[in-house]
Design a protein with these regions (language model features):
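Single conserved hydrophobic/aromatic residue that forms the stacking wall/gate
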Residues: 204-215
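A surface-exposed, charged beta-strand/loop segment in the N-terminal or early-internal portion
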Residues: 1-115
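Small-residue-rich helix-loop
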Residues: 168-174
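Short cysteine-rich clusters marking metal-coordination/redox-active sites
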Residues: 155-158, 176
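Short functional micro-motifs and their immediate structural scaffolds
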Residues: 162-164, 184
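A residue-level signal for conserved active-site and pocket-lining positions in enzyme catalytic cores
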Residues: 96, 139, 172
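Short metal-binding segments enriched for Cys and/or His
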Residues: 182-193
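A broadly conserved sequence feature marking short terminus-proximal activation segments
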Residues: 99-152
């Protein structure tokens, strides 16, 4: 057997393969997005049956094959039970996982995306914030992490950093009061909205020790 490697990450999706196996897509801190086969994981007496479903965060012992990995052992640190037991929340979680899957690449550092997904699912499970608001924050932060966020800090036309209050789709950013007259597709935003967008883009997404412990 090839050398066993331990990775930390979150299972984005789990699909049945054959009679007893599962095909997993895991976003890992060490190797980015990887495909892992969990052999026999659907057998009733398998040690992997409870730790190879979507949204499980933990450590996974895997060994690499030519095109994919095979799971040897897994240890779950967070099951997100409050999410998977709520139909509405799990629908949002699936959407968030799809976005992470879209941006994830093998051998690219995915630490910040994992942290973002982790604290987002935590927020979903707590239920203190509306799912729709969580979705908006996640979307903006995810595109910011991956370098695709609109410029919310300077005017697209003149570069000034104050009086920004018009968003333009065609310019993919904000325009100041003076330049807004040249914008045909502008949407007027309040100062608090602009500040919130800027804050989300700069948000530090590492989980707190309380979150990591799962308490």
């Amino acid at each position: 057997m090839a050398e066993v490697t331990t990775v930390t990450g979150m299972i984005l999706s789990a699909m049945p393969v054959g009679e007893y196996d599962r095909r997993l897509v895991i976003l890992t801190k060490e190797y980015g997005k990887i495909t892992v086969f969990a052999k026999g994981a659907r057998k009733p007496n398998s040690a992997l049956i409870g730790v190879t479903r979507s949204f499980i965060f933990g450590t996974f012992e895997v060994y690499r094959g030519r095109d994919s990995y095979t799971m040897y052992k897994a240890s779950a640190k967070e099951y997100f039970e409050n999410v998977v037991n709520d139909l509405n929340a799990v629908c949002y979680a699936c959407y968030f996982a799809e976005i992470a899957d879209y941006y994830g690449r093998e051998n690219l550092d995915a630490s910040e995306m994992i942290n973002l997904l982790y604290i987002t699912l935590k927020a979903l499970g707590r239920g203190a914030v509306s799912h729709e608001l969580i979705r908006f924050i996640y979307e903006i932060r995810m595109i910011a992490v991956n370098g695709e966020c609109p410029d919310f800090f300077t005017c697209h036309e003149c570069g000034r950093e104050d009086n920004l209050y018009v968003y333009s789709y065609s310019r993919n950013g904000l325009c100041c009061k003076n330049c807004a007259t040249n914008v045909y597709d502008g949407i007027t935003l309040s100062g608090s909205t602009v500040y919130t967008l800027q804050y989300i883009c700069l948000l530090y997404t590492s989980p707190s020790p309380r979150d990591i412990s799962g308490s």
